[in-house]
Regions:
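Histidine/lysine/aspartate-rich catalytic loop segments that bind and position anionic ligands
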Residues: 91-124, 128-133
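Glycine-rich phosphate-binding active-site loops on the catalytic face of alpha/beta enzymes
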Residues: 88-94, 128-136, 168-191, 197
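Conserved N-terminal beta1-alpha1 strand-loop-helix module at the mouth
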Residues: 1-83, 100, 160, 184, ...
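Catalytic cores of alpha/beta
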Residues: 70-80, 113-121, 138, 157-173
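Glycine-rich beta-to-alpha transition loops that act as phosphate-gripper elements at the mouths
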Residues: 17-20, 65-71, 87-90, 107-112, ...
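Conserved functional loop/turn residues at catalytic and ligand-binding sites
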Residues: 35, 59, 81, 89, ...
Length: 212
């Protein structure tokens, strides 16, 4: 299955930020056990490219890079195995680099003008960031003038409120600290908690009539 289709079907991208590779792999496996297999490794994490390489070799996971700020960073992440590129802001060179290498481009945008620019430059999905500042109503309102644009709200989206964004028309959500918060102790209890939260996300999405 193509990466874009996996994202559209999976609905939730788990953001792994600030962890060294060994702990990131443990977290990713817990997420997979909970049913979340779309993983974003942020480039401001320790050993981020190594983590992307390691997770790209894990069966059943689709790994992308986040906090990608320019074309050079995008290229490095892609060479490490990233299948999609996420950015917090709109930078055309990052979109173009992703497209050049045939990976999914998900730039950040905050206004209708930025969203349209990203779409016209070839972005596959637009990351609406920070999402909670705009709310689900913004996602719904954008369906009128720009129904062809795929939106993925991120930033303040939680396991509990994700379904409201999906119901409003988002093709997926980015799940950060509400799913994987930062801790110094990645022990069995922490991993069990992540697995439980991942399962909860899928259950809530299904209960609210959103296919996962």
């Amino acid at each position: 299955m193509k990466t874009l289709n996996k994202i559209l079907e999976g609905k939730g991208i788990a953001i792994i930020r600030g962890y060294h590779t060994e702990d990131a792999v443990k977290i990713a496996r817990a997420l997979k056990k909970g049913g979340v297999t779309l993983l974003e490794v942020t480039l401001n994490s320790p050993d981020a490219l190594r983590t992307i390489r390691e997770l790209s070799n894990e069966s059943g996971m689709t790994v992308g890079a986040g906090t990608v700020l320019d074309g050079a960073a995008a290229q490095g992440a892609i060479e490490a195995g990233a299948k999609f590129i996420l950015s917090p802001t709109l930078k055309v060179e990052t979109i173009r680099t992703a497209k050049r290498y045939g990976v999914v481009s998900i730039p950040g945008a905050y206004t209708p003008s930025e969203i349209l620019t990203a779409f016209e430059e070839g972005a596959d999905i637009i990351k609406v960031f920070p999402a909670t500042a705009l709310g689900p109503s913004f996602i719904k309102d954008m369906q009128g003038p720009l129904p062809q644009v795929r939106l993925l709200p991120t930033g303040g989206v939680t396991v509990e409120n994700a379904a409201t964004f999906l119901e409003a028309g988002a093709v997926g959500v980015g799940l950060g600290s509400s799913l994987v918060h930062k801790t110094e102790c990645v022990d069995d209890a922490f991993l069990d908690e992540i697995e439980m939260k991942a399962k909860r996300f899928r259950e809530l999405a299904m209960m609210r009539g959103v296919r996962t």
